[in-house]
Amino acid sequence: TDLSNNFLGKIMKKIVFFIAFTMMYCGKPAVNKQVVYGLVIHGGAGTITRENMSSEKESAYRGKLTEALAAGFEILEKGGSSMDAVEITIRIMEDSPMFNAGKGAVFTNAGTNELDASIMDGSTLQAGAVAGVKTIKNPISAARKVMEETWHVMLAGDGADYFAKEQGLEIVNNDYFYTERRWKALQKAQDAEKHGTVGCVALDRNGNLAAGTSTGGLTNKRWGRIGDTPIVGAGNYAN
């Protein structure tokens, strides 16, 4: 029917636009042409629509995604680990106000920012996560510290913030995460910008796979709410 065709058309446009904001680099040996290492990232493209995207904004998104992708790929190209590649790639997106992670995180209904992140090493099946953190500049790095420095899988809230400080990670005031765009989104509770997650999957030269995710969650979410992003096996997995 015309209705179903119209609906399918809208879905396909979103899929195409999602692919446009999901970027991948792959490295190939000179002889057999098989991919031996690579990197795939996304910047929360499920919440980015053509209607709300100017050419300038699109260029800015692509530029930052390319920067993140290049940084992670350089690590893999030099023989570095997939875990290092995932962490540095996501840190770059967390440091940008463009994405709903780190600096660009959305606001809770209490007007604060609560961030979640997780990382997993496919070679060992070890994972780490933080949830509901308010003062950790780069939650993805805290998630890795949980994995490597504790016998836990997840730390949440004040306990996670305190742990990150103990580990020497950079701590910021909660207002560091403030951006005018996200504050306005809270006021308007716009569906188009209510959620989003950044993510990265890397395969290194040793054949080890790692994955990481980071998010600010839902705009206007109830404070204390934790979504699927930091849940290993739900929002993130590598094997």
Question: What is the predicted role of each segment?
Answer:
Residues 1-34:
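Bacterial Sec-dependent N-terminal signal peptides
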Residues 31-239:
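Alpha/propeptide regions of enzymes that mature by internal proteolysis
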